[in-house]
């Protein structure tokens, strides 16, 4: 589990750049509307938290990540807002909307065939450039930033009993569950 102070610090760093999203009641449940974030997903929380945790000199060199989806856009958006360059390694088959989203925020998509992306990851290809690599879901600061969502749920829903979290790479549930369990261990978190 991620430490509560790390989550609070990450959420505080990201706060000026993300929205505290509302909850919408639907059939007895509450939906956290992260689709209202600037890039349409929760990913901006983690990328701002991670980028702002970097030493300033390292951050100024730029950001780099690997993603064919929402993390790609979140990295580009965070870099744009912080005034630093960004490259995103993407599968050449990435959806055009995601490639365009990276470009819209001034990021540079680096399109590669799938085997080349996997080789780049295996061989730590990001070390050949000056940018700071932010893993799209396994970076501890990314997960802590996503934990801000859990903090908001605990604050906004006094009778919180159960939280259902979608799971892809695991960064969202890692951060959200850590925040919730640190504050309210009796709450059931389902992925």
Q: What do the predicted segments below correspond to?
A:
Residues 1-191:
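PLP-dependent amino-acid enzyme catalytic core
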């Amino acid at each position: 589990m991620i430490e509560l102070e790390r989550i609070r610090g990450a959420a505080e760093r990201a706060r000026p750049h993300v929205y505290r999203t509302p909850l919408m009641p639907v059939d007895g449940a509450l939906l956290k509307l992260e689709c209202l974030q600037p890039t349409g997903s929760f990913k901006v929380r983690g990328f701002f938290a991670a980028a702002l945790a970097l030493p300033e000199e390292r951050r100024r060199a730029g950001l780099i990540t690997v993603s064919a989806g929402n993390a790609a856009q979140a990295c580009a958006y965070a870099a744009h807002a912080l005034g630093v360059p960004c490259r995103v390694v993407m599968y050449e088959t990435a959806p055009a909307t995601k490639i365009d989203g990276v470009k819209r925020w001034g990021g540079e998509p680096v399109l590669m065939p799938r085997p080349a992306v996997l080789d780049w990851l295996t061989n730590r290809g990001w070390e050949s450039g000056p940018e700071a690599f932010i893993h799209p879901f396994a970076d501890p600061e990314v997960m802590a930033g996503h934990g801000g969502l859990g903090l908001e749920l605990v604050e906004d829903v006094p009778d919180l009993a159960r939280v259902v979290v979608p799971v892809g790479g695991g960064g969202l549930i890692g951060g959200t569950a850590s925040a919730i369990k640190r504050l309210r261990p009796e709450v059931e978190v389902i992925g």
